[in-house]
């Protein structure tokens, strides 16, 4: 069974707690679908090409239909010509948004956290706060976790803690409403404040 590592106030291992049963046996396809939708919804969709009807010019037939020995043509803006429109090119009007229902989103997060638990990379701590506001103090916390990159979930982020974590390239500080399966799976370790963790378990 997957377990979360409980840390003391010095961010050292104090004990372990088993993850709830409803975190177990979830189909990993839920995570795939959520990650796919999350990435699609981030898509900027800026690529756009003009079709033959949108390119300026080309209203006149360039040469007579018959008698030249060459192929017939109705417009110099045909995709066959240099300077012509693009056939089947990308359009910025296309909608790439994908929807994921609430239950599936929930199961994806539970699966991602369960995976972190199996890897020994899910940590629970009573409070995450850097009162000094110094980056070196936040870096010391991350170093104690011992992972290449860390997702830190804190309720009501104060300014000092925000400033301390802001410049760390290997740590990402978020509030509970920002936590999702994509982020939980992307980082090597996840550190969650106890009140946030209890809320996650209760909502499951």
Swiss-Prot record:
InterPro entries found in the cross-reference section: Ribosomal_uL4, Ribosomal_uL4-like, Ribosomal_uL4_dom_sf
GO cellular component: ribonucleoprotein complex; ribosome
Region (Disordered): 48-73
Keywords: Ribonucleoprotein, Ribosomal protein, RNA-binding, rRNA-binding
GO molecular-function term, one example from the UniProt record: rRNA binding
Entry's Gene Ontology BP terms: translation
Xref: Gene3D superfamilies: 3.40.1370.10
Annotated function: One of the primary rRNA binding proteins, this protein initially binds near the 5'-end of the 23S rRNA. It is important during the early stages of 50S assembly. It makes multiple contacts with different domains of the 23S rRNA in the assembled 50S subunit and ribosome.
HAMAP family per UniProt: Ribosomal_uL4_B
Subunit structure: Part of the 50S ribosomal subunit.
Family under the similarity heading: Belongs to the universal ribosomal protein uL4 family.
PANTHER family: 50S RIBOSOMAL PROTEIN L4, LARGE RIBOSOMAL SUBUNIT PROTEIN UL4M
Protein name: Large ribosomal subunit protein uL4
Taxonomic lineage: Bacteria, Pseudomonadati, Campylobacterota, Epsilonproteobacteria, Nautiliales
Gene designation per UniProt: rplD
